[in-house]
Amino acid sequence: IDTGMSDTEIAGKYHHPGSVQPEGYAVYEQLENLGIKCSEVTDIIFTHLHWDHVYYLDRFVNADLHVQRTEYQFAVNPIPLYYKSYEYPVLGLKPQFDGRSFKLYDGEAEIFDGISVYPTPGHSVGHQTVVVNTSEGQYHCCGDLIFTYDNLKPVPEMHYDITPPGRFLDIVDEWNSIVELKKRAKSQEFILPTHAPEMIEIVDSKRVYGN
């Protein structure tokens, strides 16, 4: 699910100065630690196609790629405000997904037995959450729908049932998608946001979720 960000040099030069990918944390390095070669990966499901979720695709030469149709259509022809997010060629960059074919989905779908997706737009036009069934329960890999678990908390004094993140494309979609995520997930433990600080501990622990 997703392939992560670029190296530190590209991230700092073209995207967010100060962004760092620690040595050993690139997706291909993490897979190598698990004894998996990128060429052995058969499928990649993307929550969305922002630059920090699609890097190193050139290493996954045998993988089928899965994404929502609306996300793909916007990624290849974004408005100027999102040129950087999708590394649009006019900036002198080549999108990681350039020249690759995708299997496109229109809404909720089962991709494999025990692995499904449902739309969670808001952070991007066609953002989706990936659900993986395990012996422990269904884990919701929600990409950038939330950035921290605090986004799931209500704010009673403001009558908010969530605390939405500050970065979004459409706040109405974002709000409704987070509410939907909370409704579907068994508990917070079963929600895995890409950028939550706790994810580093999860990666370092090399935990395997269920079976």
Predicted regions mapped to residue ranges:
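Active-site metal-binding loops of divalent metal-dependent hydrolases
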Residues: 3-6, 49, 70-71, 123-124, ...
